[in-house]
């Protein structure tokens, strides 16, 4: 296989909470040679994440200034390899986590390229969304059989995986939150024992009814009032894992913690011997191979399925539309862009 001399990619050209205005499709030169230890991938699908907005607004890396490439995860085909690459070959289908995945081609370290049997859209869920759930629950959530677990934004790209792992791998009682009855039915079908539609029900009230002794594990994606309600219902020795705060990424709104009794979040956690943990996947590179192998085994065994949102976007020029779609809350499953 050969590569063209030029290709298109999406770049961040200014820092802003508005993804559309801060990005632009540009044409770049593609070097003829691939560096040693690197793999050139022709990108077929790229995943859209809520955290794409953190990248374009400068929240993740304060000292990095535009222009820079964006997009975190992709699935594609290996078209060239550099010297010393042994884990993949030309023609292999791979998934990868790498900055700059909103591009027609990209060069990535060979160790980040994970072979998959087919080039299917759903495999794009694996590099960020699925690994975030698997690693966060295993390494930080310290989940054990019989735990009562709460997953917020449970029908999203990473929430759907967390639900299935908690139910079908760990053997937990799983509570999921969502914003529609359609999503509620979807969540029940993949393993949620209880679903709370926060548009029509009180999360605080329903948690009080469903788990009077509290929640053992919280997989928290939303932040704001959802975070407050979840933390108020932690059990003794609970583990709260923050993997996102999508409610504030666009607005920048900071919702202070509040409890009707006036108890502070620190005292609430202290008296329950509960832990509050942040989670950022790139800081767990050393365990990623183990968890990816586990995920592929769960897929093969049917314990986990990968769901892609029914609305698929086409081309780099549609990435901003895909980000808007994700933030509208209309999706369930992973939002994807078919790059080429």
UniProtKB/Swiss-Prot annotation:
Signal sequence bounds: none
GO molecular function: NADPH:quinone reductase activity; zinc ion binding
Catalytic activity: 2 a quinone + NADPH + H(+) = 2 a 1,4-benzosemiquinone + NADP(+)
GO cellular component, one term: mitochondrion
SMART domains, alphabetized: PKS_ER
InterPro entries named in the record: ADH-like_C (IPR013149), ADH-like_N (IPR013154), GroES-like_sf (IPR011032), NAD(P)-bd_dom_sf (IPR036291), PKS_ER (IPR020843), Quin_OxRdtase/zeta-crystal_CS (IPR002364), Zn-ADH-like_protein (IPR051397)
EC code(s) of this entry: 1.6.5.5
Gene3D superfamilies in UniProt: Medium-chain alcohol dehydrogenases, catalytic domain (3.90.180.10), NAD(P)-binding Rossmann-like Domain (3.40.50.720)
Name assigned to this protein: Probable quinone oxidoreductase
Family: Belongs to the zinc-containing alcohol dehydrogenase family. Quinone oxidoreductase subfamily.
Pfam families tied to this protein: ADH_N, ADH_zinc_N
SUPFAM superfamilies: GroES-like, NAD(P)-binding Rossmann-fold domains
Keyword annotations: NADP, Oxidoreductase
């Amino acid at each position: 296989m050969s590569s063209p001399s030029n290709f298109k990619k999406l770049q961040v050209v200014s820092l802003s909470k508005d993804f559309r205005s801060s990005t632009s499709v540009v044409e770049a030169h593609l070097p003829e040679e691939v560096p040693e230890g690197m793999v050139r991938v022709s990108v077929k699908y790229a995943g859209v994440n809520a955290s794409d907005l953190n990248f374009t607004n400068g929240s993740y890396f304060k000292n990095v200034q535009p222009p820079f490439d964006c997009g975190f995860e992709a699935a594609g085909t290996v078209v060239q390899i550099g010297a010393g690459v042994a884990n993949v070959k030309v023609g292999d289908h791979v998934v990868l986590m790498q900055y700059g995945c909103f591009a027609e081609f990209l060069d990535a370290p060979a160790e980040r390229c994970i072979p998959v049997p087919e080039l299917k859209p759903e495999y794009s869920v694996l590099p960020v969304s699925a690994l975030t759930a698997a690693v966060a629950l295993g390494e930080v959530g310290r989940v054990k059989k019989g735990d009562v677990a709460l997953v917020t934004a449970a029908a999203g790209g990473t929430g759907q995986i967390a639900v299935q792992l908690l139910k079908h791998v760990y053997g937990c009682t799983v509570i999921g939150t969502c914003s529609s009855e359609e999503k509620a039915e979807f969540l029940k079908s993949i393993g949620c024992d209880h679903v709370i539609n926060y548009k029509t029900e009180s999360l605080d009230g329903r948690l009080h009814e469903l788990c009077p002794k509290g929640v053992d594990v919280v997989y928290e994606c939303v932040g704001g009032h959802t975070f407050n309600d979840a933390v108020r219902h932690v059990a003794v020795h609970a583990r709260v894992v923050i993997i996102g705060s999508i409610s504030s990424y666009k607005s920048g709104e900071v919702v202070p913690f509040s409890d009707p009794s006036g108890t502070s979040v620190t005292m609430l956690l202290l008296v329950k011997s509960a832990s509050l943990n942040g989670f950022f996947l790139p800081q767990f590179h050393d365990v990623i191979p183990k968890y990816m192998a586990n995920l592929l085994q769960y897929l093969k065994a049917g314990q986990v399925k990968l769901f892609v949102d029914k609305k698929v976007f086409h081309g780099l020029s549609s990435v901003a539309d895909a980000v808007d779609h994700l933030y509208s809350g209309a999706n369930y499953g992973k939002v994807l862009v078919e790059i080429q």
